[in-house]
């Protein structure tokens, strides 16, 4: 089962790269949606290979870092697709609400408010948390439920007001909204041996990207001035660097397998940042010889990163 989580995590990280390459306009909510899915699925994988309770709890915190803000980013994208004007005060309030919820969901091992008790067990080739829910655990269900109702309500409102006129766009939007809801509801009533939401997140990404690209080609996106791509790129780099070092710190002193995996993840992130920067600079260079030197320099830097990691 750990192998399945590992494959899903790699696919999620790859989807972030696909999103950056596919979205030349750098839509901030779209990028953060893909990043949150990658963070969540990476947390699931790290949890599945954890050997100690502390490592499992830290991995669970990484998973919640992605899953807590994922509904918010998805709601922002649905709002864009439905051509509903955003309200800065409501957006700020939702971000603050997410921060509070993140504090609650990452409290296990510190406070008994989300889980009263928590331990780990090894079953099916993976590590799982054995927990007794605390008094504030129900708040997370309420949090998710409100987001789900908001997304469904926005979608139905947009269809009724003919803000979404294409049958294909309607189908993709409804599928993206309902996909996670259906999987989440099924998981509540069936024995959960596997986090099927990790798979549904990737399906949702594919649907969102298909819808986004289709609407973009038809000129239905970016009715408002779009943010600076440079600013988004800088924020993405800062986030990825912080995330990479967070993974390295959390896995420090754990099992050899986790040590190797964490370094591979960090290496992928560093190389991704380097390649993105190189491509950006390469496009701005006219002289062929300077381009050649840039490619050689990037190759040497990637080789150095690989040797340093090994």
Which residues fall in each region the model found?
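Extracellular-loop-to-transmembrane junctions of the mid-late helices
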Residues: 1-10, 103-157, 184-200, 308-310
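Interfacial "cap-and-anchor" motif at the non-cytosolic start of specific transmembrane alpha-helices
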Residues: 2, 12, 42, 164-270, ...
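Membrane-embedded alpha-helical segments of multi-pass membrane proteins
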Residues: 5-13, 62-70, 143-148, 199-207, ...
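Internal transmembrane alpha-helix with an interfacial aromatic "cap," most often the third helix
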Residues: 15-19, 65-95, 151-156, 212-222, ...
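Transmembrane helix-loop junctions and nearby membrane-interface residues
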Residues: 20-23, 45-52, 75, 81, ...
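Alpha-helical transmembrane segments of multi-pass integral membrane proteins
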Residues: 20-43, 95, 133-189, 225-241, ...
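Helix-loop junctions on the outward
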Residues: 35, 39-66, 80, 110-122, ...
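Hydrophobic alpha-helical membrane-insertion segments
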Residues: 92-109, 295-308
